[in-house]
Amino acid sequence: MNYPNGKPFNRNKTKVGRTNDHKSSKIKYGGRGMTLEKEIELSNDYYLSIGKAVIHKKPTPVQIVDVSYPKRSKAVIKEAYFRTPSTTDYNGIYNGYYIDFEAKETKNKTSFPLQNIHEHQVMHMKAVHEQKGIAFLLIRFKTLDEVYLLPYVPFEYFWKRYQQEIKKSITVEEIRKNGYHIPYQYQPRLNYLKAVNKLILDESEDRV
């Protein structure tokens, strides 16, 4: 993917590619108070139940500080702390493709703050991308009730811009142009694999 004049190259694909369809497709199955994590969990359960994909949330690492042994056969954790995850939130297999992604939501109406992303997560996504895996972010604008899949390649541009202290966030318009809108529906709630299909198609056309 090329970035002429230092800006992301926004492909104007056919209608099966990325399109700005967030206005026309907003069927009100909506968020209904659910967190993005819960919506992804329900969707992943559905994918698994129909044999479409095996995608799970990675467990949050825990550092155990104090353990007592009231009985020889039974240990009791007295003190423990959640550690910062070293990779992304989710991974799995879909149609022979390795999927790896981070999920974030924001109440901001106009942009996604990049301070919500950690350097080690970006390095992990880069490594996945270099091994031909599919790495991306799922970003939910909570107030707008809109969810987007932002592929790693355009995200990398925005991340470098952030590191250079040019801009600390990605505007919602930049995400709409460089990402894939995921409308809510009945089953699954958040059919993000449909957006993954579009991403796979676009990347295969780029390699031709």
From Swiss-Prot:
It catalyses: Endonucleolytic cleavage at a junction such as a reciprocal single-stranded crossover between two homologous DNA duplexes (Holliday junction). GO terms for molecular function: endonuclease activity; magnesium ion binding; nucleic acid binding. Binds 1 Mg(2+) ion per subunit. Keywords: Cytoplasm, DNA damage, DNA recombination, DNA repair, Endonuclease, Hydrolase, Magnesium, Metal-binding, Nuclease. Its EC number is 3.1.21.10. CDD domains: RecU-like. Gene3D superfamilies: 3.40.1350.10. Its main location: cytoplasm. The keyword Nuclease applies. Its cofactor is Mg(2+). One of its GO terms (biological process) is chromosome segregation. GO terms for cellular component: cytoplasm. Mg(2+) binds at residues 87, 89, 102, 121. Residues 1-25 are annotated as: Disordered. The record marks 104 as: Transition state stabilizer. Endonuclease that resolves Holliday junction intermediates in genetic recombination. Cleaves mobile four-strand junctions by introducing symmetrical nicks in paired strands. Promotes annealing of linear ssDNA with homologous dsDNA. Required for DNA repair, homologous recombination and chromosome segregation. HAMAP family: RecU (MF_00130). Belongs to the RecU family. This is Holliday junction resolvase RecU. It comes from Staphylococcus carnosus (strain TM300). The gene is recU.
